[in-house]
């Protein structure tokens, strides 16, 4: 099952307000989805981390750097592919955008392998270590506001998250 094409899809939408976290504020939410196609018609999907315009830079790395390296390779040779790409890109950085782009391709190859084997991924990586996973509520994004307003809003939002039944939250 050979890799025939890799396509990056950058999705985005404008937020109704400016939001932020410890590193930056942003007005648009983006997601970078990677699609790996094979000669047998099996397709795998992955996601690259990279907020904002970083998603477009990662798209270029996936399509212009990684794709030419892996076209024609066996899609099930995930480890071989990962090390080949990593070793060819490592002079350009062992973290950040090159690894974000590689991770999206790697996730897509795992998805593809699970589909080809007709197995869920947890079976392919050694089985289920638990039968449930606790989830957390998410919120309390930064906004351009004064600290007093921020504290008040965080108290309200955390109470709302707790009322929804979450036992933990991420901010």
Enumerate the language-model features and the residues they cover.
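Glycine-rich, charged/polar anion/phosphate-binding loops
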Residues: 18-21, 120, 155-156
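Glycine-rich, aromatic-flanked loop segments that form ligand/cofactor-binding clefts
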Residues: 106-146
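Metal-dependent enolase-superfamily TIM-barrel catalytic cores that perform enediolate-based chemistry
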Residues: 131-171
């Amino acid at each position: 099952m050979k890799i025939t094409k890799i396509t990056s899809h950058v999705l985005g939408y404008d937020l109704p307000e400016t939001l932020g976290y410890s590193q930056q504020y942003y007005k648009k939410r983006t997601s970078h989805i990677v699609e790996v196609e094979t000669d047998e018609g099996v397709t795998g999907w992955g996601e690259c981390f990279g907020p904002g315009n970083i998603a477009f830079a990662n798209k270029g790395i996936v399509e212009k750097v990684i794709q030419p390296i892996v076209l024609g390779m066996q899609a099930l040779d995930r480890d071989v592919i990962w090390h080949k790409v990593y070793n060819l890109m490592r002079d350009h950085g062992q973290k950040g955008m090159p690894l974000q782009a590689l991770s999206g391709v790697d996730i897509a190859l795992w998805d593809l392998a699970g589909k080809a084997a007709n197995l869920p991924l947890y079976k392919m990586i050694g089985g289920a270590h638990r039968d449930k996973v606790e989830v957390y509520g998410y919120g309390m994004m930064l906004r351009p506001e004064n600290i007093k307003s921020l504290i008040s809003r965080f108290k309200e939002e955390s109470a709302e998250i707790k009322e929804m039944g979450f036992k933990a939250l991420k901010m």
